[in-house]
Swiss-Prot record:
Assembly description: Homodecamer.
UniProt EC number: 5.4.99.62
Name of this chain's protein: D-ribose pyranase
Localization: Cytoplasm
Matching Pfam families: RbsD_FucU
Record field: catalytic activity: beta-D-ribopyranose = beta-D-ribofuranose
GO MF, one annotated term: monosaccharide binding
Function text: Catalyzes the interconversion of beta-pyran and beta-furan forms of D-ribose.
Tagged with keyword Isomerase: yes
Active site: 20 (proton donor)
Gene name per UniProt: rbsD
GO BP annotations listed: D-ribose catabolic process
Length: 131
């Protein structure tokens, strides 16, 4: 049995398979998941697991080069935006329109769906390298 890091076998496999600049998405329970993109559905009820809890576990186990969020999060969910910025202090941040954000999800290796039910609690993580 695995002792550290991500215990979810699907998430661990996706993280292990990422190459430089590949992307994964951590999403609230309302973000549309495009056809053809791997869905890892963790949602068990509204709010569980939370977006921030899942983000923290994934971020602890992933080399992240860039973080992308919808610019709407700045006004519509300032608390989540602030927490993401505080937890992920090293990668570059990019804000795009929610429409553009959804277009970028079509190229993700996987979308991890949480139980989060607050607006724009979604992030695209671009894989970095460990050297």
């Amino acid at each position: 049995m695995k002792k550290h890091g991500v215990l979810n076998s699907e998430i661990a496999a996706v993280l292990a398979s990422l190459g430089h600049t590949d992307t994964i998405v951590i999403a609230d329970c309302g973000l549309p998941i495009p056809d053809g993109v791997k869905r890892i559905d963790l949602a068990v009820e509204i709010g569980k697991p939370s977006f921030l809890d899942v983000l923290q576990v994934v971020a602890d186990d992933m080399a992240i080069e860039k973080v992308m969020l919808a610019e709407e999060v700045i006004i519509n969910n300032a608390e989540v935006n602030k927490e993401v910025e505080m937890r992920l202090i090293e990668p570059a941040f990019e804000y795009v329109s929610h429409k553009e954000f959804k277009e970028h999800t079509k190229r993700a290796k996987a979308i991890i769906r949480t139980g989060e039910a607050t607006p724009y609690a979604n992030v695209i993580l671009h894989a970095g390298v460990i050297f």
